[in-house]
């Protein structure tokens, strides 16, 4: 009798170790090595065939490790939320995009509430691209517009997600198309030049 059998009412083969991994992307390989995939299929009454090949996953990991040794590409993430978990999915998406392009991506958070015309150049210095993050409401909006205008006038690639993309469209309408009062009804219900993006 295995020692694990004495302490819980779980089959020995259904108890797996939570092994430390260098990256979360190694966890599926570590779990498969302990037979967790087959055990789950058995418990669910599903046929257990051949162990699924994780070849593509392993190749991704190899690329990820190789990319980590390359010179990083710096991307600024402009947003208002101090809690970095608010942008976790964006950071991971940028990191994975870097892996598939054989580059390490370093994401630098830039607080949009503290961004001004006077400090934007220093805040975005050395950035290969800028991501304007999502959010709601007025807080931090002015700083996003400052960042967008700076990146547009300095030819820095800029991406926007949700409100970030709306801000890019509004800044363009205001400063390129000449609609100084362009806005979104989300922020100004009475704007005469409403920009609504379908996304």
Residue ranges and their predicted role:
Residues 4-198:
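N-terminal beta1-alpha1 cap of cysteine-dependent amidohydrolase-like domains
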């Amino acid at each position: 009798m295995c020692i694990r059998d004495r302490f819980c009412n779980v089959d020995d083969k259904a108890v797996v170790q939570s092994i430390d991994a260098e990256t979360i992307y190694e966890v599926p390989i570590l779990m498969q090595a302990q037979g967790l995939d087959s055990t789950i299929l058995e418990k669910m009454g599903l046929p257990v065939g051949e162990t699924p090949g994780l070849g593509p996953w392993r190749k991704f990991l190899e690329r990820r490790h190789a990319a980590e040794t390359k010179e990083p590409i710096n991307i600024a993430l402009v947003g208002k939320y101090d809690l970095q978990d608010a942008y976790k999915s964006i950071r991971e998406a940028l990191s994975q995009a870097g892996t598939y392009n054989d580059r390490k991506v370093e994401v630098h958070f830039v607080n949009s509430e503290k961004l001004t015309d006077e400090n934007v150049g220093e805040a975005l210095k050395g950035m290969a691209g800028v991501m304007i993050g999502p959010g709601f409401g007025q807080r931090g909006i002015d700083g996003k517009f400052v960042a967008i205008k700076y990146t547009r006038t300095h030819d820095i690639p800029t991406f926007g997600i949700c409100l970030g993309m709306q801000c890019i469209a509004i800044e363009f309408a205001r400063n390129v198309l000449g609609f100084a009062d362009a806005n979104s009804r989300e922020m100004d219900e009475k704007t005469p030049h409403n920009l609504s993006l379908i996304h």
